[in-house]
């Protein structure tokens, strides 16, 4: 950990009163969960949540570095706050997350107005790090460390659906991905600690949990214990069985899965356990085996297809979503077309797409056969059009069906509608008949008849 005392005291004025904070989160669900924990820590310290970023006494950016545009957005935000700090020296500026881990001390040099740079493994150490800042130091905390179990202070954004981290880090070495170098090695939490957190959520009237991990189906590989059959004792499958009996929790989800570890046993558990939702997010990244090999993904398209077939053989209406990268270095037009074909053949419910973006400290960034920006834009546009078409077709299967929707709140764009999600994770807007007096609470499950299907959402009417 780097601690640098600020010599120019005009740059630092210790604020004798605890003020307000603002957190902006970039990137994945793991970052969202980390932001909730940091918000809880700040409120425990006495900070209150600001209504306006430009009025906050402490501004924290929880950052992402998976693509270059995410980084540039952070630097844009920092530039605005740096100017503000020159006018208000007591303002505390914090950068957390993957960009902080990647850049470390160099980020303090690039943006000298920063007080604290901290990697993802230091989320639970925020209070101690801010204590060093209060002593007049600039701090960079990016060394790899064991992640503590302190999750008690999380300030949840939802009062119904809760994130639960079960494994941190990633041991894979995909040639395009910076995550292992910024998130560190895999660290699985022990089952009892996970169940205890879920029980607390249930006690607080949460109805749905989402288990999180960069590679969630690799959960337990680093934990001790082996069964008589020779497999690891604590796997994601075992964990699902273990937590299933927590009373009050109605729905269980998990993300993100890696095809390499997605087993028949896991599929069978999802089929047998009625709280586990029929939604599977399994990135395929490319529809071409040669590109998958260059990506170092560790599976073939045939294996990926078998996973989907095994899921649908038990759960025909399961929702399958995925991630895909286009214009990977050296990707030919024919290889790109294989990705389009896979999307059409499988009929994904949704695919999150991105054009390849070179990342620091990754093998693919050094290759000389990079694809032009023009081709990247063309391929991304075409694949997005296909995804929109297939997503709408998949959603049209719901027309005239009755779906159970967990209420999450009102539609912010239409106060006459409430909104929630189906078990298959379809965002659903619900019309309430004007002549009906309908009392509901967040977390209620209601039956909805679907009468409209759009590419990424459904609309229906309350079933009476």
Curated annotation (Swiss-Prot):
Domain annotation TRAM: ranges: 396-464
Reaction(s) this enzyme catalyzes, per UniProt: N(6)-dimethylallyladenosine(37) in tRNA + (sulfur carrier)-SH + AH2 + 2 S-adenosyl-L-methionine = 2-methylsulfanyl-N(6)-dimethylallyladenosine(37) in tRNA + (sulfur carrier)-H + 5'-deoxyadenosine + L-methionine + A + S-adenosyl-L-homocysteine + 2 H(+)
Pfam families: Radical_SAM, TRAM, UPF0004
GO cellular component: cytoplasm
Known cofactor(s): [4Fe-4S] cluster
Segments forming domain MTTase N-terminal: 19-135
Keyword Nucleotide-binding belongs to the record: no
Region forming the signal peptide: none
Entry-linked Gene3D superfamilies: Methylthiotransferase, N-terminal domain, tm_1862 like domain
Family: Belongs to the methylthiotransferase family. MiaB subfamily.
PANTHER family, alphabetized: CDK5 REGULATORY SUBUNIT-ASSOCIATED PROTEIN 1 (PTHR43020), MITOCHONDRIAL TRNA METHYLTHIOTRANSFERASE CDK5RAP1 (PTHR43020:SF2)
Protein name: tRNA-2-methylthio-N(6)-dimethylallyladenosine synthase
């Amino acid at each position: 950990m780097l601690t640098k005392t600020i010599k120019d005291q005009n740059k630092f004025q210790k604020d004798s009163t605890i003020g307000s904070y603002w957190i902006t989160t970039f990137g994945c669900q793991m970052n969202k969960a980390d932001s909730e924990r940091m918000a809880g820590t700040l409120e425990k310290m006495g900070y209150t949540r600001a209504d306006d970023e430009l009025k906050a006494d402490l501004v924290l950016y929880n950052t992402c570095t998976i693509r270059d545009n995410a980084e540039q957005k952070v630097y844009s935000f920092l530039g605005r706050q740096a100017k503000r700090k020159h006018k208000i020296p007591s303002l505390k500026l914090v950068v957390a997350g993957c960009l902080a881990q990647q850049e470390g001390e160099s980020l303090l040099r690039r943006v000298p107005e920063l007080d604290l740079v901290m990697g993802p493994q230091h989320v639970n150490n925020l209070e101690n790090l801010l204590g060093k800042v209060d002593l007049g130091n600039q701090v960079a905390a990016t060394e790899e460390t064991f992640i503590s179990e302190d999750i008690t202070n999380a300030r949840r954004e939802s009062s119904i659906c809760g994130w639960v981290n079960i494994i941190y880090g990633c041991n894979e070495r995909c040639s395009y991905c910076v995550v292992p170098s910024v998130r560190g090695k895999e660290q699985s939490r022990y089952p009892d600690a996970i169940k205890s957190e879920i029980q607390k959520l249930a006690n607080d009237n949460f109805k749905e949990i989402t288990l999180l991990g960069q590679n969630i189906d690799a959960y337990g590989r680093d934990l001790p214990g082996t069964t008589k059959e020779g497999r690891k004792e604590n796997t994601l499958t075992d964990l699902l069985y273990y937590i299933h009996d927590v009373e009050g929790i109605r729905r269980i989800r998990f993300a993100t899965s890696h095809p390499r570890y997605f087993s028949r046993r896991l599929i069978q558990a999802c089929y047998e356990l009625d709280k586990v939702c029929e939604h599977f997010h399994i990135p395929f990244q490319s529809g071409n085996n040669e590109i998958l090999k260059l990506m170092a993904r560790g599976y073939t398209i045939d294996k990926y297809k078998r996973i989907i077939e095994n899921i649908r053989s038990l759960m025909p209406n399961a929702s399958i979503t995925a991630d895909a990268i286009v214009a990977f270095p050296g990707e030919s037009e024919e290889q790109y077309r294989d990705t389009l074909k896979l999307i059409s053949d499988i009929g994904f419910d949704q695919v999150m797409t991105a054009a390849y973006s070179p990342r620091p400290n990754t093998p693919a960034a050094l290759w000389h056969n990079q694809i032009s920006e023009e081709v990247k834009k063309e391929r991304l546009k075409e694949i997005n059009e296909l995804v929109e078409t297939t997503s709408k077709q998949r959603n049209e299967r719901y027309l005239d069906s009755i779906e159970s929707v967990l209420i999450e709140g009102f539609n912010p764009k239409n106060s006459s509608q409430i909104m929630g999600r189906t078990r298959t994770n379809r965002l659903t807007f619900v019309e309430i008949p004007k002549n009906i007096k309908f009392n509901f609470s967040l977390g209620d499950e209601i039956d909805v008849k679907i009468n409209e299907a759009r590419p990424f959402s459904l609309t229906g009417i309350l079933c009476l």
